[in-house]
Amino acid sequence: MNLRVLVDNNTYIDRYFIGEPALSFFIEDREKRILFDTGYSHAFIHNAEKMRINLRKLHYIALSHGHIDHTWGLTDLVRLFMEAKGEKIDHTIPTVIGHPLVFNSKLFPSEGEIGSLLSEEKVNYHFPVHLSREPFWLTEKLVFLGEVDRKFDFEEDEPIGSVIIEEQYEDDYVVDDTALVYKAKEGLVVIVGCAHSGLCNIIEQAKMVCEEERVISVIGGFHLLNPSKNRIEKTVSYLEKLELQSLYPCHCTDLQSKIALARTGIVKEVGVGLNIEWK
């Protein structure tokens, strides 16, 4: 499997890509091409073109959850495919994969809508949509986890605004947050978007779904923005016990958390343009 970072908060020196506080990864495995999240704007398309990645040939668009920094680029992706149809440019019709609540409206008092700008219905006009709480295998080795069980008390979080479910406002604990997992030869690679479900919870879910205890790498947003001392210490302790080969914290992982995670001795730099391969 090959993974390239299309969008992150950071870009590399002398790599002239666009960064934004968002996330988007391009993944290739066994001739399948997957876009994991779409960032906040058109930046992922701009960066993909500079990397010579043809996003018109996707098989899946997998969404980690519904927040703006992971779904608002969908509008630009729809436009890309509309223009391909109009100009008769060769393209596929990818399937959108997500949790059943990924397109529900999410509201925050000071900002208004912080969920997807497009409803499931509107997305379905352009791409087939498959929403599932259960795991869904994208390839023989790459799985969309579905809804994540939240086991660890230290990863409990406050709600982020509200979510509208069946016309009712409910506290939003972002239960739509999920991840992808790749079954490499030496163990699991866990690919997270924002880890609202809790990084350790997600890894435990990955081990259960894949029936594999070995975990070799984790990449993505770890949802460690000003975490409590208890949370960061227990997270680091959990990760140390996994005996990982590499750790790629990015997006919603603040500097102090990265410094704490560096105790593992395996933290790697992440930025737009990063290209990683696992076998």
Kindly give the residue locations of the regions a language model identified:
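Active-site neighborhood of divalent metal-dependent phosphoester bond hydrolases
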Residues: P100-Y125
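Active-site metal-binding motif and surrounding structural segment of the metallo-beta-lactamase
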Residues: A43-G98, C210-S217
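Short acidic, glycine/proline-enriched helix-loop-strand junctions
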Residues: A84-P94, Q256-W278
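Active-site-proximal loop/helix segment associated with metal-binding centers of metalloenzymes
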Residues: S110-I114, E134-E186
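Active-site metal-binding loops of divalent metal-dependent hydrolases
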Residues: D8-N10, T38-S41, G66, P100-V102, ...
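General small-molecule cofactor/ligand-binding pocket signal
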Residues: R4, I97, P128-R133, V143-L145, ...
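Conserved beta-strand hairpin/beta-sheet module of binuclear metal-dependent hydrolase folds
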Residues: M1-M51, Y173, D177-V192
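Cap/insert and terminal regions of metallo-dependent hydrolase folds
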Residues: Y60, G66-G73, Y173-A179, K183-G271
